[in-house]
Amino acid sequence: PRVLALFAQHYPQIRLKVQVNSTRMIAKNIINREVDLAVVGGEIPDKFRKNLLIEHFVEDEFSLIIPKSHPFASKKQITKEDLYHLNFITLNSNSTIRKFIDNILSQNQIETKQLKIIMQLNSIEGIKTAVSLGLGAAFVSSSAIEKEIELKTIEIVKIEKIRITRTLSIISNPECYKSKAFEFF
């Protein structure tokens, strides 16, 4: 969001249209020339890769956020075992982000089916609000919680020996004309 805001401030004459969708759907829209450019974080299906120009953009780290009132808030780091004592608020189980996080946790010998998921929501904003109200903990992109960290409504806690990151990529159709707006971005 911050990158888009900066771009819009620098180039107010360029019309931005922001869509949130699955990486698969966005890739299809790029190939079908319905969208010029997209920033995606999910895995791009192999069948679409040959028809796309893919440029790695930035590393996106996910943070474990907890309410300020939680006993772990005074710790800067917790163990993997501590995760089993948290109530989690997550995206729904079909979410690409949720699957990605579950996969990383599983690779680190964390039984995701044993985690206490008390709430599944459809938006990051809803998750951040629920955490700030003290309802539970969640994994969210660090770039999505800058305001909450500044306002001190939540705490970030590191997990010993675990770091969850993904690469955000810019994708476009190599066969399409690249406008000046595209080049500016």
Positions of PLM-derived features:
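A late-sequence structural motif
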Residues: 155-185
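Short beta-strand->loop
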Residues: 52-62, 150-164
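Central regulatory/effector-binding core of bacterial HTH transcription factors
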Residues: 1-45
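Alpha-helical segments flanking ligand/cofactor-binding loops in enzyme cores
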Residues: 27-28, 55, 81, 128-129, ...
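Short beta-strand elements of ligand-binding domains
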Residues: 37-42, 66-67, 91
